[in-house]
Amino acid sequence: PNGFNEVSAFMSDNPFIQYLMQPILLIGVVYHFVMGFVLEAQNKKARGPVAYQKYNGAANASWMSRNMLVSGSVILIFLLLHLYDFWVPTITDHYIAPNPEFAQGNYFMDHLNHVFTLEGALSFVRLVIYIVAFVFLSLHLQHGFASAFQSIGARHNKYTPVIVAFGKWYSILIPAGFIIIAVYHFFVK
């Protein structure tokens, strides 16, 4: 708990993170999401007004590549919930209506535990939402990681298999770590 609180306090008090990195991250997420919609619209426009007579999406593209907009939308909804759960209370308790508990050492860990120990079934529903969102994040990353390299022209017989393999591991390990954190805080109250 102490390490978690120290890192969280560092991030909430560090002007570099709060006033430079956080806005850049927000702009990047919004840009990424908007470009996802733009790309989807361009793809639909390129197909024309007539639908395919017979469409076999699996013939040329994986399920993940065909459903990036779906997984991205689930992730965006989750991000809004996550901001509501953590960012809004932190900003409120730190800047808007200062809470004396904020200066105490366990504020962040206590708040994290609170989110997953809400009224009975609500905390279980919250846990399920987090897990489902992280599964969608895994699917989104599995396609998006290698696809990002291909989009910037980094496609080569020698390097692409390494990028794809790294992307698969990355897309499993990062969301799995987030799932472990959520499950841990649900069961360790």
Language model features with spans:
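Membrane-embedded alpha-helical bundles that constitute the cytochrome b-like, heme-associated redox core
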Residues: 1-189
